[in-house]
């Protein structure tokens, strides 16, 4: 498969999968789940190495189950009721995909996501949301100020960039509101682009996050 070819050709990717497999093994889950679509690059090889089935979850909440022998089938007939998964993700921000799609899709099959395993936690509240949802998060990397302060000392980022990042980490909501107020045409321009840009801008508006002065006229 393409994933196996990438594992063979990229030592960093292979080592990452080794680390995730080691972490996932300790959960003793019944199967592995992953969400469309970046999660699949991590969840599928980990499932294969653990000898477990894999539940592919799509954004429309549809699912496909592939057993440990590589046979794909209708998830409803896969006997997942009462089973527990470890859901493997690339990145956790505020866990919105879990809340909107991954958790409901697994529960619709009578199963539960019992554990979450991610490569990176951006440390923006997603971990607490997952804990409250009953699928506590384990991560290989958590984004903290130390990461960016080290990058600054190494000359990878400027002082201005460091200041911006630290301000965002300290209060992401206030940072974004200040940004929108400083760029009052930003949401209008994003909506005009269409596609995902428009969807994100409209979500920002409908969620009540955008300040009144930053709303499209």
Question: What is each of the regions a protein language model found here?
Answer:
Residues 1-89, 93-217:
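PRPP-associated nucleotide enzymes
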């Amino acid at each position: 498969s393409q994933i196996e070819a990438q594992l063979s050709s990229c030592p960093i990717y292979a080592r990452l999968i080794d680390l995730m497999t080691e972490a996932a093994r300790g959960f003793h889950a019944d199967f592995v789940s992953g969400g469309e679509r970046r999660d699949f690059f991590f969840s599928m090889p980990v499932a294969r190495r653990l000898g477990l089935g894999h539940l592919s979850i799509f954004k429309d909440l549809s699912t496909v189950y592939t057993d440990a022998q590589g046979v794909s089938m209708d998830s409803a007939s896969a006997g997942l009721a009462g089973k527990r998964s470890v859901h493997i993700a690339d990145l956790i921000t505020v866990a919105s995909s879990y809340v909107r799609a991954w958790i409901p899709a697994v529960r619709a099959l009578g199963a539960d996501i019992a554990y979450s395993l991610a490569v990176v936690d951006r440390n923006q509240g997603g971990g607490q949301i997952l804990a409250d949802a009953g699928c506590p998060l384990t991560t290989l990397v958590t984004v903290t100020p130390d990461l960016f302060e080290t990058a600054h000392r190494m000359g990878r980022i400027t002082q201005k960039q460091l200041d911006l990042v630290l301000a965002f980490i300290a209060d992401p909501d206030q940072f974004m509101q200040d940004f929108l107020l400083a760029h009052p045409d930003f949401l209008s321009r994003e909506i005009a682009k269409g596609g995902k840009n428009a969807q994100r801008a409209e979500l920002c508006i409908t969620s009540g996050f955008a300040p009144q002065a930053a709303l499209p006229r």
